[in-house]
C-alpha cells in the first residue's frame, strides 16, 4: 500500500449542497437559492460545486420526487455566478442518459460523477466513456459502499478506472460505515488503482461520523472530500463542510478554502431553507443503524404519516430487506406489509 502525507497535499473540496442537499428539502431549491449558494461557495474557493436533482440528472419523477426546476435551470443559474469552482453533476445510469450528459456539458458542467450501486460498476461504462469523449472529468461513484467488502469495492473501482474514470469514490450512502470500514476501503482501493487515479470520500452523518470518516479517509490517502454547507443532505446530512474545514484547519491540512465564509453561508443562507432540521434524530439514526439509503428518509416519513406507522419501523424493515437506491417504490410496499402485520396481530388478540 502506498502511504501519503496529508500536511502539504491539497485536499480537493467537493461541495454537494446543491445536489445531495436537495433531498433535505424535497428538491425544492429555487433558482435564486442555487445562485446565492453557488456564489457563496465560489467566493469561499471550494474546488467544485455539484448541481442536480438529488437523484442526479433527470431524477425529477414520481419515484424520486419532482424538482422545483429542471437540472438545466439550476445549472445555468450556478454557471451565471461561478468564477473559480468547476461545476459538477451526478448521473445515475438508467435515470440520466448520455443525451442529458451532453446537455449538462453545454450548460457548463465539467465534472460528472457516474453513480452506481457498489457492485454494479459495469453499468457505468457508456456514461464514463461519453464524458471523457466530451472532455469532461469522469468520476466513479460507488454508492452504498457498506454493503460489500473492501476487496469487492476495490474491484468495482478498478472497473470504473478501466472505463476512463480519473477518480473513484467510496460513497457511504447509508451513513453506516465505521472509521475502520473507511480505512479498509481506501487501503483496498489504493492497492489496485493506478497511482494517478484519485480517490474520494462521500460521507453521511447518520451515526455522527461524517466528519470523522472524512478525516480518516484523508489520512488513508483520499484525495477528495464531499461535504455540504450545514450538512445539507439526505438523512442526517453529509459531512458538514464548515465543520470538516475547521477540523482540517486545526490539523494543518491544505484545503484552500475560507472557513469564515463557509460558516456564514451555512448559517445565513442554507440553514434557513430547511423545512425539517438536518440532524441526527430518531429517524435519521435508524438510517445509519439499519444501513438504509439516506434519501429514503423523507419518502418513509410520508408513508408513515399516510398509513399511521412509525418511520423507524419502516426504515428498519427496509434495512432488513437490503433495499438500495432506486427502490423507493418499495417503501410503500413495506409500509403496507407492516400495516397488514399490525392488523392481523390485532385480529388475533
Swiss-Prot record:
The keyword Manganese applies. Substrate binds at residues 19-20, 173, 202, 293. Coiled coil: none annotated. It comes from Bordetella avium (strain 197N). The record marks 19 as: Transition state stabilizer. This is 4-hydroxy-2-oxovalerate aldolase. Signal peptide: none annotated. Its EC number is 4.1.3.39. It holds the Pfam family HMGL-like. Keywords: Aromatic hydrocarbons catabolism, Lyase, Manganese, Metal-binding. One of its GO terms (biological process) is catabolic process. Transmembrane segments: none annotated. CDD domains: DRE_TIM_HOA. Mn(2+) binds at residues 20, 202, 204. GO terms for molecular function: 2-isopropylmalate synthase activity; 4-hydroxy-2-oxovalerate aldolase activity; manganese ion binding. It comes from the Bacteria. It catalyses: (S)-4-hydroxy-2-oxopentanoate = acetaldehyde + pyruvate. SUPFAM superfamilies: Aldolase (SSF51569), post-HMGL domain-like (SSF89000). The active site is at 23 (proton acceptor). InterPro entries: 2-IPM_HCS-like (IPR050073), 4OH_2_O-val_aldolase (IPR017629), Aldolase_TIM (IPR013785), DmpG_comm (IPR012425), DRE_TIM_HOA (IPR035685), PYR_CT (IPR000891). Belongs to the 4-hydroxy-2-oxovalerate aldolase family. Residues 11-263 form the Pyruvate carboxyltransferase domain. PROSITE patterns: PYR_CT. The keyword Lyase applies.
